[in-house]
Amino acid sequence: PRSPYGKRSKALDPAGAAAFGARLKAEGYGPLVVHAPYVYNLAGKDEAKRAFAIEALAEDVELLTAIRETGQEVYINIHPGAHVGQGSETGCRLISEGLNQVFERADGVMVLLETMAGKGTECGRNFEELATIMNGVENKANVGVTFDTCHVLDAGYDLVNDYDGVMHQLDVVIGLAKVKAIHVNDSQFGLDSHKDRHANIGEGQLGIPFFTRLVNDPIMAKLPMILETKEQTPATHRDEIELLRGLVQK
């Protein structure tokens, strides 16, 4: 609906939204996962900025609902927020309260909380914090999770050496059914670094064996996978998609 760095969105064109959704569905696209602007901070202490984030996110949900009504599956992904010194407990509570306000106005599209690397005062730095936020949301059906592979490793979960253990923990704390999308990124700095620096596929600390495991996981492989790696050349993402597809065991 708007630039990831911008604050304003264009007015909704119902006919255009319907045509877009119908075309996606007709051409066999999977779920549409929109990334909300990075400037949203539902956990912030600045009341004006927090009010803006709530209002803008509600507007985004309203806009995307017009596409969902065509039958196209749609989600909006957000970075949960940063508590900026208020403490994670307060930050998680504010995020839940903000989402409840969003859903009072618009509830036609599920909001996905992205797993975070734990940089600075980020909330959502572990599965427990995400679960706390989700448990504070009144309409549980309106909230899910985006699993960012780089962020999860950077947050301290050993996806390389204990893939099954991490997935079990994710299932116990949040529930695998709540995971609706995957951001597929390698990691420059790796386990427990809290750096959030993406690397191209196979060129970081996760490595090809991990991605082989991921794309052959019977549950995770069914989810939409979105690359957020650096485009080194115009062919980078095409080549990475081909690489990932080549890892799928027939």
Question: Language-model features: where?
Answer:
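Histidine-acidic metal/acid-base catalytic patches
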Residues: 131-250
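Active-site acidic/histidine proton-transfer and metal-coordination neighborhood
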Residues: 25, 41-144
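Hydrophobic residues within beta-strands of alpha/beta enzymes
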Residues: 32, 75-76, 111, 182, ...
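N-terminal pre-domain/capping segments
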Residues: 1-36, 40, 44-59, 250
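Alpha-helix N-cap and loop-to-helix initiation/capping positions
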Residues: 8-16, 45-56, 86-97, 121-129, ...
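Alpha-helix-loop-beta-strand connector modules within alpha/beta enzyme cores
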Residues: 14-34, 95-108, 131-137, 205-217
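Active-site beta-loop-alpha junctions enriched in small/polar residues
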Residues: 1-3, 37-39, 81-83, 114-118, ...
